[in-house]
Each structure stands twice: as C-alpha cells, then as structure tokens.
Amino acid sequence: MSVRLSLPAPAKLNLFLHILGRRDDGYHELQTLFQFLDHGDELHFEARQDGQVRLHTEIAGVPHDSNLIVRAARGLQEASGSPQGVDIWLDKRLPMGGGIGGGSSDAATTLLALNHLWQLGWDEDRIAALGLRLGADVPVFTRGRAAFAEGVGEKLTPVDIPEPWYLVVVPQVLVSTAEIFSDPLLTRDSPAIKVRTVLEGDSRNDCQPVVERRYPEVRNALILLNKFVSARLTGTGGCVFGSFPNKAEADKVSALLPDHLQRFVAKGSNISMLHRKLETLV
C-alpha cells in the first residue's frame, strides 16, 4: 500500500436551518439539510513511522496544535493505538467562518485518509463517533451522504434530493458561530418539519436575520444575489448561495455580480467527492 495519499475535503451547504430549542447543556436542538458541493480543499498525506503528526501548512490565527486537522490525526492515533505518524499539507480553498464546513471537512478527510493509510480498518460508525468529538458537523463529512440532520446536527438520515448547480458568494467576514447562537434575538422555537416540507420550499435559515444584522457585508451580498435568484445564508454564514438548474445559468449570474465579490460556482452532490475518490482506492 502506498504511504502517500491526496484527498479532497468538500464544502457543504445547509439548505435550511431551523432551531427548535436550547438544551440544558447550552447546545441547540436543530434541524438542517446538508448537501455537498464539488468544490473544496485538498489535503496531502504521507505516513511516518516515528509517530509524529506534522501539519506543514500554516493557517493564520490557528495554532498548529489547535487545528482540527492535527486534532483529528492525534485523536485517531490515540483511539486506535497506532504507532504511525503523518505529514500533512493543505491546499486551502474554503473560507474560514463561511458556513460551508471548511474545518470540519478537513478533519473528516484526515480521519478517513489515515484510516486508509494506517490500515486501521475502522468502520463508518466508529469514525463518525470520533468525528463527533471534534465537531457536530464532522460526522456528515465522514459519512459522505446528503442528510437531514437533527439533534445538535449529529442525528443523520440520508436523503436523495435534486442536485442543482449553486452560485456561492463569499463575503469577506469571519462569522463567529458561538456569537450567533448566543444572540438573544435568535429564533429558538421553530416547529419541527419534514424533509418533504423543505423540498416544497417552506423553510428558512433561523440564523440569517441575526447574521444580517451583525454583518452588513453578508446583508449586502444577500441583497445583490436576491436580484437574480432566491438567496439564502448557509449555516451561520457568512457564505450565501442560490441554486440553478445548470452551470450556464449559474455562470451567467456570477458574471453579473460586482468584481469585488468573491464567489464560485459548483455542482451539488448527494455523495461527496471525497467518498467518490475513496471508492476508487478500494
């Protein structure tokens, strides 16, 4: 088996986000619908025999040992008892604080890559359980299927939904998830709904009004995108998105947006590009 491996870490969108209540431990009960994008970071791994975990790519403002990639590698190392280590390089394309899962996706890709490189043989459930300790969004990336999520986001029901093209606008802000969920004006009493209701269009993102109020850049991006398509915030933001039936229409609207707005066009996918790549390795 090769000691080197390169894998993608795909972005995700929250197609809606309803907050049902707040638990005694401070976490929020929610419902959301995750779908992947064929766009993301790229990670490169090379196994080491001395047990060291080294991330060779610096992320501004994130200490090496606090990076989710390093925490994922060390967590798997400890839980599995593997004596092996790894060198990791990251091609970072996804924004931090964007609501499209950059850090969680990187962590999930790390877990799956090292399960393969270190020949651990862990099953999907065991990897997802370890991923949940790193963050509520990590399991959806380790499982790799579009899903209706409940609880704090960890109860996942796979779904088969349309796979449109998306135009994603990336405002230049770093949104604090903790800040949004602690805002006293955040809606916390949305009624539970079914997936069918979401697909019929009766849903929203409960975080969006709070984010728009706190971050004018996000509000302005929504105003601009709403001129061409129904736009919505993903997660706690700050990325916003609109869906299109084909790439040509998404590209057309992208070309009409101001040059200063960062954005990208990507296809939605119910099976993540990470898992499609992993299937070719088996």
Curated annotation (Swiss-Prot):
Keywords: ATP-binding, Isoprene biosynthesis, Kinase, Nucleotide-binding, Transferase. The active site is at residues 12, 137. Pfam families: GHMP_kinases_C (PF08544), GHMP_kinases_N (PF00288). Pathway: Isoprenoid biosynthesis; isopentenyl diphosphate biosynthesis via DXP pathway; isopentenyl diphosphate from 1-deoxy-D-xylulose 5-phosphate: step 3/6. GO terms for biological process: isopentenyl diphosphate biosynthetic process, methylerythritol 4-phosphate pathway; terpenoid biosynthetic process. Its EC number is 2.7.1.148. GO terms for molecular function: 4-(cytidine 5'-diphospho)-2-C-methyl-D-erythritol kinase activity; ATP binding. SUPFAM superfamilies: GHMP Kinase, C-terminal domain, Ribosomal protein S5 domain 2-like. It catalyses: 4-CDP-2-C-methyl-D-erythritol + ATP = 4-CDP-2-C-methyl-D-erythritol 2-phosphate + ADP + H(+). ATP binds at residues 95-105. Catalyzes the phosphorylation of the position 2 hydroxy group of 4-diphosphocytidyl-2C-methyl-D-erythritol. Belongs to the GHMP kinase family. IspE subfamily. This is 4-diphosphocytidyl-2-C-methyl-D-erythritol kinase. It comes from Pseudomonas aeruginosa (strain ATCC 15692 / DSM 22644 / CIP 104116 / JCM 14847 / LMG 12228 / 1C / PRS 101 / PAO1). The lineage of its organism: Bacteria, Pseudomonadati, Pseudomonadota, Gammaproteobacteria, Pseudomonadales.
